[in-house]
Amino acid sequence: EAAGFEIILIETVGVGQSETAVHSMVDVFLLLMLAGAGDELQGIKRGIMEMADAILINKADGDNLIPAKKAQAQYKSALHLFPPNTNGWIPQVGVCSALEKTDIDKAWDIIGQCTKWTQERGFFESKRQEQNRYWFHQMIKERLQDDFYSQHQQQIAELEQQVMDAKLSPSQALQQLFK
């Protein structure tokens, strides 16, 4: 945004910490899935599904169209098992094909609807405020960590060696570090 872009897309490589970080910096969190990839409704996806404002099943074309529609129905059904979003938005589930360029417009419509919903109800601005607070605290943590490690590097290395040599337990080493 600072560079003047109105739309910024952020892609992550999988399920993990990166998605949590990305969720704290975006207006709409879109989960892109593939039908038949073996991860439909797995427990590992639960956390990321709860964060999603929308789920799109891509590659809904050719022989994969029917499995994609089936996955769409499964995800729609599964979303009812999760707690509702605090902003009242009900996550949408769609299918699309980047290859055949089908239903991409519907994907943009879902993003637009979610954005409009949150803006009209004041959640857009409050989410931005919460994101700013989150990043402020992240920056504090990073700065404190950097400062602490640089000031105690030698002591940490010595205690670390004692832990590795089983002369101290990790908790004992921690107590010594903070004396």
Where are these regions (language model features)?
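Long, well-ordered amphipathic alpha-helical subdomains in the mid-to-C-terminal portions
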Residues: V95, K106-K179
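Short, acidic/turn-prone active-site loops that include or flank metal/cofactor-
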Residues: L34-D39, D61-G62
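Inter-motif core of Ras-like GTPase G domains
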Residues: A2, S18-G36, R46-L56
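Conserved ATPase-coupling elements of RecA-like P-loop NTPase cores
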Residues: V15-V22, E40-G43, P67-A68
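Canonical P-loop GTPase G-domain recognition
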Residues: A54, A60-R121
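Short, high-confidence coil segments that cap the C-terminus of an alpha-helix
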Residues: F5-E6
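Walker B catalytic acidic pair
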Residues: T12, K59
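Residues on a specific face of well-ordered alpha-helices
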Residues: S24, G43-R46, E50, K69, ...
